[in-house]
């Protein structure tokens, strides 16, 4: 429920499919999120979202349309979301948090000085930043002037991978990121590759038209010194 420039800050829950019961488990987590409106309380469930949709737009009679509308009306309190995630061992093991980094519906749009601390708390809570901006990637890797990886660790819990946002608002934009800024993750096609990217964002996450062709500088041996080894001459 934190306002950005043209909407509210979008926070995404990326759920690991490794647990066979992950769908029922995430439903349990979402059910704990509540929205108070219209002198009532609504839980984040299909039934409650349909009810919310029909109450906020009485012209809607179709359940699918009501679900869609209700989902746009339902606003999650940040402190409540953080509490729900932190209180669940399953959530901490199986959910990665991604936050939009742009101005429209991301943390870059939280510009008021009074909200600076809240913005920092949201970004600290997130594992991943949804942004394809080169400037944002440099920032979250600690490569910008005046901000080191150690500074990021203290203020935000560490460096974070930047990936192109997963939202698509129309069919034409599916698989067609702006300026061909595709997301590349080093690893197998499994959720654990995302976890590894959060641990090593510089080496395992990249945004661009093509993945890096050569090894990263940090993974290249620049010189070798061998002492007391005549056989190496």
Name the predicted role of every residue range.
Residues 34-37, 53, 68, 89, ...:
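Generic secondary-structure transition motif, activating predominantly at the C-termini of alpha-helices
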Residues 1-32, 102-233:
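Charged catalytic cores and adjacent phosphate/nucleic-acid-binding surfaces used
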Residues 10-64:
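Active-site gating loops and adjacent loop-to-helix segments of metal-dependent hydrolytic enzymes
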Residues 49-115:
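Hydrophobic, aromatic-enriched interface-forming segments
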